[in-house]
Amino acid sequence: MKLKNLRWWVIILIAIATVINYIDRQSLSVLWPEIVEDLYPDESTLERKQIYANISSNFVFSYAFGQAIFGKIFDWVGTRLGFVLAIGVWSIATALHAFAQGVISLSIFRSILGVAEAGNWPGAAKSNAEWFPTKERALAQGIFNSGAAIG
């Protein structure tokens, strides 16, 4: 059985993945006051800010690195398997945050998250090109991009 307008359901699922992607990304900044008290109770305010900055920088550089990696992965394995891989790895990385014991483990988990979450954008762009004719791509792009604003 073929679903009518399947491409619109695909782009909606990508938008939902984008919402989750951005919630994961922003959650550290929201939870940092509690995390820092738990992991670094003896550090000064300045040292805590520096730790946060270092962890955030690791995430950003990992995300940038992941863009190129996942661009190639999506071209190699296709969009379906590429999304399974990206979302699977970022889900595991998110869960691993609960086991962080310090700056090194938290940085590693954030870096893995950054690399994996980076797959969302190349995958979304490739899906858009595969599923939508040229005259509908801008709308589809707008729908999945709205996930970033919501998340």
Language model segments and positions:
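Hydrophobic transmembrane alpha-helices of multi-pass secondary transporters
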Residues: L6-N21, I55-F59, V89, S105, ...
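Residue-level signature of mid-helix packing/kink "hotspots" within the transmembrane helices
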Residues: Q26, F59-A68, A118
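Transmembrane alpha-helical cores of Major Facilitator Superfamily
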Residues: V19, A53-F61, G88, A95, ...
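Extracytoplasmic
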Residues: W9-P41
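Cytoplasmic helix-loop-helix junction between adjacent transmembrane helices
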Residues: F109-G147
